[in-house]
């Protein structure tokens, strides 16, 4: 959710205990679990949630509105429909709030990312918050959306201002929405408005200088929930149904499955002996806290015995390697390919900021979802592998062609060795999954790279893009760019934030 919601929520959590207030539905010694859904597993909730403190229901905002439909995954959950009004009762768990529906009067846990404060901009379908211009264009150009599809986002360069992005046939036009000193907003000074609501309403009725009238708020993707359910981390194997094998690698298999008969998931099964269960548990505890829109969300684990199961969100497009080499991505053009690389850089920039190292960044470890969404998978697992064929750089399983020389030869894995691997990943993307250093063995590759050899420019690769790759392959790790830099330069590869904003009445161009 946007920052508005998070600030309000923080304030609400600091409210004094209102457990006996008339605004609170829960009463002492009353179980909050009024729902009882058949065929849905309980996840060890034998007690009501702790409601002392924090409680909502005082002078702060307690009424939120649902942004998406949600179907209960466990018996303690609350199902709701988009637009439904909910009273938030408890936010002690940041990911799963306890709420009451003002329509059904039922209570239960809800994913906090599915709701926003009532009458806030975050609750509007057309408000996209911190989405950048390039991301706005990608969303608005999804196939099938009509002209006039629009969104409002925060301005990237002017704090307090906004941008209106509108689809116009095969292009997107952007308008600056400036803030008045009196608190209102305007695109042109001849038509000021008290709020963004009034601005949207006006330009929905009449183009009044825009390329066209506003017709449809840009569709939003459902966010990933913070975990699969409240307190569901170490889950019973019996709660998983493995339906279809998606692939098999050196260390196990990946399956499409269903958890608890309610939720589609992906399940990675690790071959016995691949890694220590105890070490994995420690690492998984860190991994589950790493959350970003371009990281695959770790939902749950089964580590009571081998094989270890890793349960994650399901990505319909499979691995980026397969997607580009033999899937729907074989005909993708350069702008989409560069956008995919930018998404990976975004996820890695988050890991960089957290001081976390991937160690095995490659197209096979990037997963693809709807609308070309890319997410980094398997971050951190490489460090735990106990197979000599993998851990020794001359081993048959070691990914020499993706690994920086200082990491391959001296085991010096850093975020800068990940940057080197990202350059190889960029080459994979441009060549639609071609194996790096074609025609060279692993031994030849490491020997030649040490001498200064770098892959030559690939067919169809623009020179500026190749120059970015060369920066990532700098022999000195400290002279390689950061992922934050790579994200920015790739996101802006085709777009300059200083150009392309329009004034009302400007001729189409």
Swiss-Prot record:
Residue segments, region Disordered: 1-23
Domain SH3 stretches: 59-120
Lipid anchor positions (N-myristoyl glycine): 2
InterPro entries, per the entry: Kinase-like_dom_sf (IPR011009), Non-receptor_tyrosine_kinases (IPR050198), Prot_kinase_dom (IPR000719), Protein_kinase_ATP_BS (IPR017441), Ser-Thr/Tyr_kinase_cat_dom (IPR001245), SH2 (IPR000980), SH2_dom_sf (IPR036860), SH3-like_dom_sf (IPR036028)
Disulfide bonds: none
Modified residues (Phosphotyrosine): 390
Occurrences of domain SH2 (ranges): 126-218
Reaction equations catalysed: L-tyrosyl-[protein] + ATP = O-phospho-L-tyrosyl-[protein] + ADP + H(+)
Annotated gene: STK
Gene3D superfamilies assigned: Phosphorylase Kinase, domain 1 (3.30.200.20), SH2 domain (3.30.505.10), SH3 Domains (2.30.30.40), Transferase(Phosphotransferase) domain 1 (1.10.510.10)
Family from the record: Belongs to the protein kinase superfamily. Tyr protein kinase family. SRC subfamily.
Domain called Protein kinase: residue spans: 240-495
Residues reported to bind ATP: 246-254, 268
Polar residues composition-biased segments: 1-16
Entry protein name: Tyrosine-protein kinase STK
Translocase recorded as keyword: no
Gene Ontology terms for molecular function: ATP binding; non-membrane spanning protein tyrosine kinase activity
Keyword line: ATP-binding, Kinase, Lipoprotein, Myristate, Nucleotide-binding, Phosphoprotein, Proto-oncogene, SH2 domain, SH3 domain, Transferase, Tyrosine-protein kinase
């Amino acid at each position: 959710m946007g920052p508005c919601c998070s600030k309000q929520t923080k304030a609400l959590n600091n409210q004094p205990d209102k457990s006996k207030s008339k605004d609170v539905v829960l009463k002492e010694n009353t179980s909050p679990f009024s729902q009882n859904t058949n065929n849905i597993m309980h996840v060890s909730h034998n007690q009501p949630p702790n409601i002392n403190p924090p409680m909502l229901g005082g002078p702060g905002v307690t009424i939120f509105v649902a942004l998406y439909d949600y179907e209960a995954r466990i018996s303690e959950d609350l199902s709701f429909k988009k637009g439904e009004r909910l009273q938030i009762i408890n936010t002690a768990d940041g990911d799963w709030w306890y709420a009451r529906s003002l329509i059904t009067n039922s209570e239960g846990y809800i994913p906090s990312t599915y709701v926003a404060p009532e009458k806030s901009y975050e609750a509007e379908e057309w408000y996209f918050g911190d989405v950048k211009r390039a991301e706005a264009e990608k969303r608005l150009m999804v196939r099938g959306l009509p002209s006039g599809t629009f969104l409002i986002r925060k301005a990237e360069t002017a704090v307090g201002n906004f941008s209106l992005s509108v689809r116009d046939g095969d292009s997107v036009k952007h308008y600056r929405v400036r803030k008045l000193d009196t608190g209102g907003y305007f695109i042109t000074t001849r038509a000021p408005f008290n709020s963004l609501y009034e601005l949207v309403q006006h330009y929905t009725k009449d183009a009044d200088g825009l390329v066209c009238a506003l017709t449809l708020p840009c569709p939003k993707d459902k966010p990933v929930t913070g975990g699969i359910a409240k307190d569901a981390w170490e889950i019973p194997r019996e709660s998983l149904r493995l339906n279809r094998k998606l692939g098999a690698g050196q260390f196990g298999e990946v399956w499409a499955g269903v958890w608890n008969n309610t939720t589609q998931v992906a399940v990675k099964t690790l071959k016995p002996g691949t890694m220590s269960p105890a070490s994995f548990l420690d690492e998984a505890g860190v991994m589950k806290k790493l959350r970003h829109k371009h990281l695959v969300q770790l939902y749950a684990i089964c580590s009571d015995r081998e094989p270890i199961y890793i349960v994650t969100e399901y990505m319909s497009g499979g691995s980026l390697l397969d997607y580009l080499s033999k899937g729907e991505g074989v005909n993708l053009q350069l702008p989409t390919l560069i956008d995919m690389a930018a998404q990976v850089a975004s996820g890695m920039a988050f890991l960089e900021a957290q001081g976390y190292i991937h160690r095995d960044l490659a197209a096979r470890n990037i997963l693809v979802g709807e609308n070309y969404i890319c997410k980094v998978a398997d971050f951190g697992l490489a460090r735990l592998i106990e197979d000599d064929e993998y851990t020794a750089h001359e081993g048959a399983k070691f990914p020499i062609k993706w690994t920086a020389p200082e990491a391959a030869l001296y085991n010096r894995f850093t975020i800068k060795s990940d940057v080197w691997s990202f350059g190889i990943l960029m080459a994979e993307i441009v060549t639609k999954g071609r194996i790096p250093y074609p025609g060279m063995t692993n031994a030849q590759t490491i020997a030649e790279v040490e001498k200064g050899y770098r892959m030559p420019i690939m067919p169809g690769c623009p020179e500026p893009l190749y120059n970015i790759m060369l920066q990532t392959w700098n022999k000195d790790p400290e002279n390689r760019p950061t992922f934050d830099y790579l994200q920015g330069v790739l996101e802006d590869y085709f777009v300059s934030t200083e150009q392309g904003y329009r004034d009302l009445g400007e001729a189409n161009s």
